[in-house]
């Protein structure tokens, strides 16, 4: 295992180094921000309206789930272990300054998330069962002419399947098993068996079942965790200004060693901030476009705006809560091998009894469970794009069995594999976003000119779509 982890770490270091993924992620996000005229900043308020829109005023018959369910499914995939353990890992290696780079990745990533969700709906198709099928595997192949698009689509599908086993399975199952053992004394093998049964049962219901469950549980999970985090932060109210000063200072200077912290460079802050940022919000990975493609929406821009809010909620709200809890709680300089308990320790120092550790442990368990379900859908859709519907059942069976492996395996290997898979899945998608940015910018501009307040009735929007010759349904 150690030799395998070393090999994967070496490859991951190259992929996530200063010459490949970091400039590609930040550069594409900046480029899309410019092409879309800072859409993530000027339309965020209007986009929020569509998150809570009712079926009658914002949805069209085409699609499998509501736009709200598409958002919560995407949130289920992103608001997971990365928001708690991932952020702690970034701070333990990159220092408090890594949080700034997570924010930058998130803000620029909102433009990427809008673009990939837009394209997910724009190029979606209907499969043999009458369900919507979309995502990078569709818009890369159908949107980019020539063999390049097809090649990128195949690579994305392969890497997405790998990512579903990493970020969506091994890392999540390991986190659940670790917390079940530390909090409730349940053996990892028993947790693996429970996950196998629960996830397997949900997967039998497909995207509709996943959408219903995430719509019910994800908002509640986020609210409980955020409220607990805010209580911890304001219990250290006098230390908040110093915490922000440290965060911004360390983002652009080297962090000195102290406690269990061995020090970090600016490059480490950037590398781990960006890596954990994408692990948290998945902007640029293309995964959320698969859920967006299943949404009932009269125009791609509407779902793009809804999906864009997911990155804001995930990174600017939930990740910020975790980061501030760790910094003001004084646990960020613990030994990096203890990154998994940094957040719980910060909670426990403020909340009475075992409440702190229990809240964090339960949050990790429920966040991870919802992430597993969403990524099972992403991986299945990606495999179907290569092998057809016949591959669905074997994939679900293997995915469920792998949860047991993740529950009893080493955390370091699970995270290393997840980091590498995240990087590989993003590369073909980011290339596609760059090449298709002109199409998205042009059609978004036309739509916002037609519906600047984003409140046109569905029938008028559909008539506009037809007048533009957009054959996207």
What residues fall within each predicted segment?
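N-terminal alpha-helical transmembrane segments of multi-pass membrane transport
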Residues: 1-81, 91-98, 109, 404, ...
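Membrane-interface loop-to-helix entry segments
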Residues: 24-28, 32-48, 156, 173-180, ...
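Extracellular/periplasmic helix-exit of transmembrane alpha-helices
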Residues: 116-124, 228-246, 254, 258-260, ...
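Alpha-helical membrane segments and immediately flanking helix-loop junctions
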Residues: 57-93, 119-137, 141-143, 158-161, ...
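Transmembrane helix-loop junctions in multi-pass membrane proteins
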Residues: 3-4, 36-40, 83-87, 164-176, ...
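Helix-loop-helix module between adjacent transmembrane segments
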Residues: 28, 32-33, 105-130, 141-174, ...
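Selective recognition of specific alpha-helical transmembrane segments in multi-pass small-molecule
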Residues: 108-116, 193-207, 218-238, 271-276, ...
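Flexible loop linkers connecting adjacent transmembrane helices
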Residues: 38-65, 89-99, 103, 111-148, ...
């Amino acid at each position: 295992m150690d030799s395998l982890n070393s090999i994967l770490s070496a490859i991951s270091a190259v992929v996530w180094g200063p010459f490949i993924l970091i400039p590609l992620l930040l550069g594409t996000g900046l480029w899309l921000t410019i092409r879309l005229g800072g859409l993530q900043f000027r339309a965020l308020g209007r986009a929020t309206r569509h998150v809570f829109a009712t079926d009658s005023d914002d949805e069209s018959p085409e699609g499998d789930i509501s736009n709200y369910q598409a958002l919560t499914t995407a949130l289920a995939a992103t608001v997971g272990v990365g928001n708690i353990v991932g952020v702690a890992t970034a701070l333990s290696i990159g220092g408090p300054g890594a949080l700034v780079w997570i924010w930058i990745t998130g803000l620029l990533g909102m433009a990427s998330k809008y673009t990939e969700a837009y394209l997910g709906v724009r190029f979606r198709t209907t499969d043999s069962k009458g369900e919507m099928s979309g995502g990078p595997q569709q818009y890369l192949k159908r949107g980019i002419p020539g063999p390049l698009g097809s090649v990128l689509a195949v690579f994305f599908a392969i890497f997405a399947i790998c990512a579903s086993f990493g970020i969506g399975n091994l890392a999540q199952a390991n986190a659940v098993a670790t917390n079940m053992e530390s909090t409730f004394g349940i053996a990892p093998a028993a947790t693996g068996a429970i996950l196998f049964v629960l996830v397997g049962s949900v997967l039998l219901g497909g995207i509709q079942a996943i959408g219903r469950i995430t719509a019910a549980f994800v908002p509640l999970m986020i609210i409980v965790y955020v409220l607990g985090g805010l209580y911890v932060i304001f219990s250290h109210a006098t230390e908040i200004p110093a915490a922000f000063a440290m965060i911004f200072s360390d983002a652009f200077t080297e962090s000195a060693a102290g406690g269990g912290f061995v020090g970090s460079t600016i490059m480490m802050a950037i590398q781990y901030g960006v890596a954990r940022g994408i692990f948290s919000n998945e902007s640029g990975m293309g995964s959320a476009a698969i859920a967006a493609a299943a949404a009932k929406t009269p125009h791609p821009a509407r779902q793009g705006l809804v999906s864009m809010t997911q990155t804001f909620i995930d990174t600017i709200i939930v990740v910020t809560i975790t980061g501030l809890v760790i910094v003001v709680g004084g646990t960020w300089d613990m030994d990096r091998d203890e990154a998994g308990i940094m957040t719980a320790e910060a909670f426990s120092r403020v909340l009475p009894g075992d409440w702190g550790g229990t809240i964090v442990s339960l949050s990790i368990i429920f966040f991870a469970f919802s992430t597993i379900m969403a990524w099972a859908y992403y991986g299945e859709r990606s495999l179907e794009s290569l092998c057809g519907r016949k591959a669905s059942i074997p994939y679900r069976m293997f995915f469920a069995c792998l949860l047991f492996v993740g529950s009893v395996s080493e955390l370091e290997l699970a995270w290393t594999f997840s980091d590498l898979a995240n990087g590989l899945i993003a590369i073909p998608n980011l290339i596609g976003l760059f090449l298709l940015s002109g199409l998205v910018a042009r059609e978004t501009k036309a739509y916002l000119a037609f519906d600047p307040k984003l409140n046109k009735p569905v029938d008028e929007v559909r008539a506009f779509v037809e007048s533009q010759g957009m054959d996207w349904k």
